[in-house]
Design a protein with these regions (language model features):
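Short acidic-glycine-tyrosine-enriched beta hairpin
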Residues: 70-89
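Ligand-binding loop in jelly-roll beta-barrel domains
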Residues: 87-112
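Short, surface-exposed beta-edge/turn micro-motifs
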Residues: 28, 55-56, 88, 97
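Residue-level detector of beta-strand face positions
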Residues: 22, 65-67, 92
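Short strand-coil-strand connectors
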Residues: 26, 69-73, 94-96
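A short, N-terminal "cap"/entry segment at the start of jelly-roll beta-barrel domains
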Residues: 1-42, 49, 116, 121-126
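Short, conserved beta-strand element in jelly-roll/cupin
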Residues: 51-68
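A short, polar/proline- and glycine-enriched secondary-structure boundary/capping micro-motif
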Residues: 42-44, 78-80, 110-113
């Protein structure tokens, strides 16, 4: 596939508070994320290295607000802003946030599998 849109995305993952629609482009995942309710990923990242996301992400926020915490600071990303999240971040978003994100496919798949397992252990899996 050489292109992907929210509507054409072949993969849909429902996390409860959020829905990801995505596809792959030459080793990178392209994910369109819709946040349905305020969601802080702190609990679902506990147990991963550093209790944070080990996968880098590049992206663009189209609506809402995304707050990204690091060990020594936090950043707020708002509509119209592009971002880079290096490994070691903990994101939180308000309801109504929409973004598109690009991540190395293999790293993202490993992180998502670990996150889903942690959510199931915590009784939050869908």
């Amino acid at each position: 596939m050489s292109k992907v849109s929210r509507e054409s995305a072949p993969d849909v993952t429902d996390y409860g508070p959020a829905e990801d629609r995505g596809g792959q482009l030459d080793g990178y995942a392209v994910i369109f994320t819709s946040i349905r309710e305020d969601w802080d990923l702190t609990p679902v990242l506990k147990g991963l290295p550093g209790d944070s996301c080990p996968c880098p992400h590049w992206g663009y926020v189209t609506a809402g607000r995304l707050t990204v915490r690091y060990g020594d600071h936090e950043e707020v990303i708002e509509p119209g802003e592009a971002f880079y999240m290096p490994p070691g971040h903990v994101p939180a978003a308000v309801a109504g946030t929409e973004l598109v994100m690009f991540s190395p496919q293999d790293e993202l798949a490993a992180m998502e599998a670990a996150m889903r397992e942690l959510m199931m252990q915590q009784g939050n899996g869908n």
